[in-house]
Amino acid sequence: MNKYSIYVDHTLLKPDASLDEIHNLCEEAEENEFYSVCINPCFIKVAKHYLLETPVKICTVVGFPLGANTTETKVFETRNAIALGADEIDMVININQLKSANREYCLQEINEVKKACSDKVLKVIVETALLDQEQKEFAARIILESDADFIKTSTGFAKEGAKLEDIILWKQILGDAKQIKAAGGIKNLDDFKAFIDAGATRIGTSSAIKILNNQ
């Protein structure tokens, strides 16, 4: 096993992903001992079958990719995903409410979804490409105050993905109280290592095989 494998959420979230591609994703995750596969909810059940009796976790997305669903919808999505077999939930926060610094709304949404997660892991996607510096700091402080397990940079569908300076900023605010997932645009081993060194404990990427083979 590559020493970096355990950091990887092996990701396939494109809207036209096929069953064959999901099968291949799961095989790669098992062979390379990645931490999880990150897939759309419609594939949870089949991925659970492919990964039966392996340690690979199943991560899925909620409120994805815009975050504009109601909290009630996100709670339903979360419960449904876990019933299907998801181990981790990557939920897109309501971006408008976050940018408006609506602390009460953001906290309530995160905590309601975490309650629906029960003992499963909740990562909150804040879409850094749409935030200014003050909003990024606010996002980290909301996560620190909330019941979430992780803050996550990006959906991979915005104009930019993870930036090293954001991981450094969040690590300063969060310390070891919450974990950080860097995702979006991570394509080479040097960047992968830099994000880990800066404090990320999980990397979401669709390029994990190439990255860890240093291609």
Curated annotation (Swiss-Prot):
UniProt GO BP: 2-deoxyribose 1-phosphate catabolic process; carbohydrate catabolic process; deoxyribonucleotide catabolic process
Protein role: Catalyzes a reversible aldol reaction between acetaldehyde and D-glyceraldehyde 3-phosphate to generate 2-deoxy-D-ribose 5-phosphate.
Disulfide bonds: none
Species per Swiss-Prot/TrEMBL record: Ureaplasma urealyticum serovar 10 (strain ATCC 33699 / Western)
Pathway: Carbohydrate degradation; 2-deoxy-D-ribose 1-phosphate degradation; D-glyceraldehyde 3-phosphate and acetaldehyde from 2-deoxy-alpha-D-ribose 1-phosphate: step 2/2
Family (UniProt): Belongs to the DeoC/FbaB aldolase family. DeoC type 1 subfamily.
Name of the protein described by the UniProt record: Deoxyribose-phosphate aldolase
Keywords, ordered alphabetically: Cytoplasm, Lyase, Schiff base
